[in-house]
A protein has these predicted regions:
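Structural signal for interior beta-strand "rungs" in well-ordered beta-sheet cores
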Residues: 49, 113-185
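Terminal amphipathic alpha-helical/low-complexity segments used for targeting or macromolecular assembly
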Residues: 1-118, 177, 183-184
């Protein structure tokens, strides 16, 4: 499933990504990396990481082109995956993730929100006072939204859900029959 919340700004040259993480002493032929993903969902053209032996079974079958790992774990990776050795795997992954998804680290307020009275949900949802709804929001049937709540852009809420008062929802896919209590963020 593609990520509905954050925009991928790639592809990037592998050597440019390594410079970001100060791992440029390891150099590879010019190759474009499309995305950073977990071991299980990565494909050719992606970069992944292995930081714990607990994921060794997933590592053996990864389809990623590159993997950031350490000396201790690199033997679990398939021959088709080029190994990038790091002493600080998770920090390097954070730097690369920030490059691919720069808006994933911000906590900016969604300025696309508008009062629910001005949206398509005005007559479809029971709601309290002062409710703000962002763009591209989906809300199922039989839902309730409490006072002073904000549902930011690209949120999907299933059927028969209740959202309490003073709730802020961002970057979420909410299934059916979910109850979010007052004050949750």
């Amino acid at each position: 499933m593609s990520n509905p919340f954050f925009k991928n700004t790639g592809p990037y040259d592998i050597n440019d990504l390594l410079k970001l993480t100060k791992l440029e002493y390891q150099s590879f032929e010019k190759e474009r990396i499309k995305d950073i993903k977990d071991l299980n969902s990565s494909q050719k053209g992606d970069i992944t990481f292995l930081h714990s032996k607990r994921y060794s079974n997933l590592a053996k079958s990864t389809k990623a082109s590159f993997c950031i790992t350490n000396e201790r774990l690199n033997s679990f990776l398939p021959a088709s995956c080029k190994i990038i050795i790091s002493d600080k795997i998770l920090l390097d992954v954070a730097q690369i993730t920030k490059k691919f998804y720069p808006n994933s680290i911000t906590d900016d307020f969604d300025d696309s929100v508008e009062y629910i009275e001005n949206t398509q949900f005005k007559d479809k949802v029971k709601y309290g006072r002062n409710i703000l709804i962002g763009k591209n929001v989906e809300i199922g049937s039989k839902c309730l939204i409490g006072h002073n709540s904000i549902i930011e852009k690209n949120i999907s809420i299933g059927d028969n859900c209740s959202i309490g008062s003073n709730v802020i929802i961002k970057n979420s896919l909410i299934k059916n029959n979910v109850h979010i209590l007052d004050g949750c963020v």
